A protein has these predicted regions:
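Pyridoxal 5′-phosphate
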Residues: 1-99
Length: 99
């Protein structure tokens, strides 16, 4: 019987070719992309290539693509920037915005 998964808020099934590429990159480019040594620079190059590919698909600049470590970090980042850079005075939200 085929599974139907409807809880994609925090997780989602991964296509096999995506999983294969992720494993390949994690095994070969394991450096910290924030480091200045050669392994870190190599990892950073992979991240920047991904950023450019995503930007091309979204028809935007690579500088507009921001990677965060979680939905919580992303939500906090956008809310803080809405207040500090765009003068947003009031934010209305609910408990269901991030479960």
């Amino acid at each position: 019987m085929k599974k139907i998964y409807l809880d994609n808020a925090a997780t989602t099934p991964i296509r096999q070719e995506v999983s294969d590429e992720m494993v390949n990159v994690m095994q070969s480019e394991y450096g910290n992309p924030s480091s200045t040594h050669s392994v870190g620079r190599s990892a950073k190059a992979v991240v920047e290539t991904a950023r450019k590919l995503i930007a091309k698909q979204l028809n935007c600049n690579a500088q507009e693509i921001i990677f965060t470590s979680s939905a919580t970090e992303a939500t906090n980042w956008i809310l803080r920037n809405a207040v500090s850079h765009f003068g947003v005075k009031r934010i209305i939200t609910s408990k269901i915005e991030h479960h």
